[in-house]
């Protein structure tokens, strides 16, 4: 590659990183949070629910839900799983309105205290247009990955080490290149699946009206393979045995892992029951993998599956489990892959943060005004978001359950994040302010883990979900370590070695 082409790739990588880096950090951090949140449902429950106990029959829990006012005619029952031992009852739109303790049938508090950051990642609180906007950042990440690989192609021989003793700037450059090169497969996975998740949905919505003029909903029915409509048959004589139906399905398809039971026309003689889940070796979700049964006698009627469908449709279906680390179809290795997926999400956030830092330091030396503007945005938006997430976790675990408390927690999140942004725009020493934010965030995450562990020991007599507590404490310690003021000699600008061109 000639010098002019290399210079253009450098300019693209630096310019795109500076222009989009702050928003990209928000997308990456909120995405990593979303992944962790899905595995922390049980962490938000009362600790006693996670203790192994005999469970009530599913029919008894369904009757309990009906007594509490849940409409079961067309409902979705999310079965207990290791990361959330509760059984949840949701409507046809999959909005869950009730959670029960499967051992006692007692109602459980909502676990949606941290969904504000999940919604931030999925839609930016803007509905479907926000989902499309977020997916565009997958394309931005892909462009940055390609440009970074071209820029650092000579760094492959040194990609296994991070040099020390050459100053903070060189160490951060090496860390940035190390994450980018070794984490490239995961970064491409995040970017590609993230872009397809939103843009694929946009294409489906746009083409549905063309494929089925006047009846666009038929496109979604064909995509999902929903059960055929049935006529009303009057009230049934007795309710079916759902546990027996689950056992029958397990005997028929032993490689299938049930996740939900979907009720259609419950209470009618022609009621149908779908068992949704995932199959071993098939990258799909419970939305597309379903077994249909007649409720009254348990007769199997049909299977809906992505297996055997067109290549592009199967690729589109596989996007969600790959993007959100839903590796249940992998088997025993699924948990390890999910942890690795999460760690690479954190690494992607560090990649973005180090890139922003290097660009700001390079431009701040000649007192470039754009560097000061970007520094204020990066410190306030990125550092403030990390702190707001920690405050949300700590306060959410320390405060009692209640609707008013949930509302106050949402206000706390926005107040902390907004306050961090406002102060970052006003303070003169933004590096010192960033260290303050990181110290506060580190303390918040560590206290969140310690608080839950203490509550678990008091309420259940054992440290349930201790790996999550340990991860929170470790992340808090990492933030506290990173917030330490660097030594004066480490802050001196070192000469960048050959092949380590600064941003």
What are these regions (language model features)?
Residues 1-503:
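Conserved histidines in hydrophobic membrane contexts and catalytic metal-binding motifs
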């Amino acid at each position: 590659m000639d010098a002019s082409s290399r210079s253009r790739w450098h300019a693209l990588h630096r310019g795109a990183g500076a222009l989009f880096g702050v928003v990209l950090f928000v997308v990456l951090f909120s995405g990593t949070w979303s992944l962790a949140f899905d595995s922390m449902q049980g962490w938000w429950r009362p600790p006693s629910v996670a203790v192994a106990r005999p469970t009530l029959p599913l029919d008894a829990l369904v009757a309990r839900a009906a007594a509490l006012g849940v409409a079961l005619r067309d409902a979705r029952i999310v079965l207990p799983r290791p990361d959330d031992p509760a059984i949840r009852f949701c409507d046809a739109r999959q909005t869950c309105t009730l959670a029960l303790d499967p051992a006692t049938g007692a109602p459980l508090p909502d676990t949606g205290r941290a969904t504000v950051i999940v919604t931030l990642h999925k839609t930016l609180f803007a509905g479907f247009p926000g989902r499309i906007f977020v997916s565009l950042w997958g394309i931005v990440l892909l462009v940055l990955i390609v440009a970074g690989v071209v820029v650092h192609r000579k760094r492959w021989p040194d990609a296994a080490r991070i040099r020390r003793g050459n100053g903070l700037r060189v160490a951060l450059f090496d860390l940035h290149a190390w994450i980018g090169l070794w984490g490239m497969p995961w970064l491409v996975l995040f970017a590609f699946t993230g872009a397809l998740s939103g843009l694929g949905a946009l294409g489906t919505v746009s083409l549905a009206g063309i494929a089925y003029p006047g009846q666009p909903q038929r496109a979604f029915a064909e995509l999902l393979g929903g059960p055929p409509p049935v006529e009303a048959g009057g009230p049934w004589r007795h309710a079916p045995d759902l546990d027996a139906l689950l056992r029958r399905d397990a005997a028929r398809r032993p490689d299938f892992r049930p996740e939900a039971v979907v009720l259609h026309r419950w209470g009618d003689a022609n009621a149908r029951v779908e068992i949704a889940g995932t199959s071993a070796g098939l990258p799909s979700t419970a939305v597309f993998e379903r077994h249909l049964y007649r409720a009254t006698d348990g007769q199997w009627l049909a299977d809906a599956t992505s297996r055997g469908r067109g290549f592009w449709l199967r690729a589109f279906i596989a996007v969600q489990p790959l993007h959100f680390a839903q590796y249940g179809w992998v088997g025993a290795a699924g948990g390890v892959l999910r942890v690795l997926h999460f760690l690479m999400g954190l690494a992607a956030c560090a990649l973005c943060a180090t890139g922003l830092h290097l660009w700001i330091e390079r431009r701040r030396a000649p007192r470039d005004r754009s560097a000061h503007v970007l520094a204020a945005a990066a410190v306030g938006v990125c550092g403030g978001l990390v702190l707001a997430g920690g405050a949300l976790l700590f306060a959410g675990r320390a405060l009692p359950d209640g609707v008013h408390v949930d509302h106050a927690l949402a206000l706390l999140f926005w107040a902390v994040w907004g306050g961090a942004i406002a102060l970052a725009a006003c303070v003169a020493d933004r590096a010192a302010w960033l260290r303050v934010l990181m110290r506060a965030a580190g303390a918040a995450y560590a206290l969140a883990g310690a608080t839950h562990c203490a509550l678990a020991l008091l309420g259940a007599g054992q440290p349930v979900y201790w790996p999550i507590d340990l991860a929170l404490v470790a992340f808090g310690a990492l933030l506290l370590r990173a917030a330490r003021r660097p030594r004066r000699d480490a802050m001196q600008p070192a000469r960048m070695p050959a092949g380590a061109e600064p941003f």
